[in-house]
């Protein structure tokens, strides 16, 4: 009986080969798959907000709320990896690894990153408006209050606000950046573990643990925030400029560092550098 998983070196080679395929993918397919990835991550975010919406107000410990939020969110990345789609944060690992292994180009990276980022945003905002707000799922309490707290914590740039009767501090630019570094380090490891596994159950567990960890810790994922913060915008608690300037820019940059440096570069150096 053969092994059901790849060695770390073979996994690095497989990721490099995937980068080559992404380099050659037709633009139209990348656009569709990027829209789907944004929607899939948004589904995970919507599920997490629904199941935890009233927990803080009901007096549950903050750690338990984070645990439940993190436990259900990984369904989004499971859909991305197993059903197939183009997720910007995963591409922050794939494309640099392919470039270092001479199987992808800088121009291919730029095309892939820009396309996946833009259409991840389109897919996530689509779910935020049409499936979370227009449906009424997140417009009634306690879910509206919970969704607004999540969005404000991420997007108010260090300002304080009242949530569940308590003063809550939002993230500063630097905090958002470093939380994003940690986030995509773990997200890309989740993708790496999924590629390492040759069966679907192994892929599911390989994804679940690192994604659960990043969410429960409180790290920042750019594509997830393309859902969480627009929900807050549609509910009237945050502005588009606050979204981009205070969160999406630093979190995107931090996600690039986390995936490209701490996963792609280090595993290329360890397993692929000749």
From Swiss-Prot:
It comes from the Archaea. One of its GO terms (molecular function) is high-affinity secondary active nitrite transmembrane transporter activity. It is a multi-pass membrane protein. Pfam families: Form_Nir_trans. Keywords: Cell membrane, Membrane, Transmembrane, Transmembrane helix, Transport. The lineage of its organism: Archaea, Methanobacteriati, Methanobacteriota, Methanomada group, Methanobacteria. GO terms for cellular component: plasma membrane. Belongs to the FNT transporter (TC 1.A.16) family. May act as a formate transporter. The keyword Transport applies. GO terms for biological process: nitrite transport. This is Probable formate transporter. NCBIfam families: fnt. The keyword Cell membrane applies. The chain crosses the membrane at residues 31-51, 62-82, 118-138, 176-196, 200-220, 226-246, 248-268. It comes from Methanothermobacter thermautotrophicus (Methanobacterium thermoformicicum). It is found in: Cell membrane.
């Amino acid at each position: 009986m053969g092994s059901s998983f790849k060695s770390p070196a073979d996994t690095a080679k497989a990721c490099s080969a995937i980068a080559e395929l992404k380099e050659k993918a037709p633009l139209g397919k990348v656009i569709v798959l990027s829209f789907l990835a944004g929607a899939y991550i948004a589904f995970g975010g919507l599920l997490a907000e629904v199941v935890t919406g009233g927990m803080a107000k009901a007096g549950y410990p903050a750690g338990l709320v984070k645990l439940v939020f993190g436990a259900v969110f990984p369904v989004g990345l499971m859909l991305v990896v197993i059903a197939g789609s183009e997720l910007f944060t995963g591409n922050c690992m794939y494309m640099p690894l392919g470039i270092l292994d001479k199987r992808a180009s800088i121009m291919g990276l730029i095309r892939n990153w820009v396309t996946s980022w833009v259409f991840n945003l389109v897919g996530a905002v689509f779910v935020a408006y049409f499936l979370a707000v227009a449906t009424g799922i997140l417009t009634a309490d306690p879910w509206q209050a919970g969704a607004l707290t999540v969005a404000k914590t991420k997007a108010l740039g260090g300002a304080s606000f009242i949530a569940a009767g308590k003063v809550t501090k939002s993230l500063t630019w630097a905090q958002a950046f470093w939380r994003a570094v940690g986030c995509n380090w773990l997200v890309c490891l989740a993708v790496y573990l999924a590629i390492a596994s040759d069966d679907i159950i192994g892929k599911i567990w390989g994804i679940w643990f690192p994604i659960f960890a990043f969410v429960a810790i409180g790290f920042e994922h750019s594509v997830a925030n393309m859902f969480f913060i627009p929900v807050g915008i549609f509910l009237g608690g945050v502005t588009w400029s606050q979204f981009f300037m205070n969160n999406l820019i630093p979190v995107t940059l931090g996600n690039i560092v986390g995936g490209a440096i701490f996963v792609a570069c280090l595993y290329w150096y360890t397993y692929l550098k000749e």
